[in-house]
Curated annotation (Swiss-Prot):
Binding site for Zn(2+): C186, C196, C199, C202
Protein name: 7-cyano-7-deazaguanine synthase
Recorded name of the encoding gene: queC
Keywords linked to the UniProt accession: ATP-binding, Ligase, Metal-binding, Nucleotide-binding, Queuosine biosynthesis, Zinc
Zinc in keyword set: yes
Entries under InterPro entries matching the protein: QueC (IPR018317), Rossmann-like_a/b/a_fold (IPR014729)
Cofactor mode of binding and number, as noted: Binds 1 zinc ion per subunit.
Any GO BP: queuosine biosynthetic process
Alphabetical list of PANTHER family matching this protein: 7-CYANO-7-DEAZAGUANINE SYNTHASE
Residues binding ATP, per UniProt: L8, S9, G10, G11, M12, D13, S14, A15, A16, V17, I18
Organism listed in the record: Xanthomonas euvesicatoria pv. vesicatoria (strain 85-10)
Pathway assigned in UniProt: Purine metabolism; 7-cyano-7-deazaguanine biosynthesis
Amino acid sequence: MKKAVVLLSGGMDSAAVIALAQEQGFAVYALSVRYGQRHTSELDAAARVAAAQGVVAHKVVDVDLRSIGGSALTDDIDVPDAGGDGIPVTYVPARNTIMLSLALGWAEVVGANDLFCGVNAVDYSGYPDCRPEFVRAFEVLANLATKAGVEGVGLRVHAPLQFLSKADIVREGVRLGVDFGLTVSCYRADADGRACGHCDACRLRAAGFSDAGVPDPTHYAILS
């Protein structure tokens, strides 16, 4: 069976991506990164999703981006309730580049020629590393920078959610049997994975379920 490394954050998008990769016949190797994120309960969610969706292996890699800083997700900076103009403070510098690089390294080790990630350019928060140009550029890099690429084995970077709305992602997940109740999206999620209901990630997630006409399985803290 062909193999793929899938980036798994523990959120709804990456859970849907695993299901889509499996539907395409890939044996999935899921990679999560403990990068110093304050909402560490997403890693607990990643473990739940990996187990529920039957991945071949789930690896958690430690890369502490707090030493670099520059993001409300790693630093002692308030997470805003809603997105504004420009690149938001929840952007983690070079995060997707770093994570895809780790996925690329593992792919070479396990003999996978395909990488999957859940970046989205429709209902997203304005992150530069979620754009189609970034995904295309990383695929070029992957084929230039690896033994497999130099030997003529084409490496592919898939972003199957890139042009889907959050509602579309919900519908695809439901079609494929994804249990979104296992996932955590909130930037302020507590230790039990309960969502704040106010941050940009919560807003986008809630709108996705509402627009799709699907009951929202998110576990919320008491909303004020």
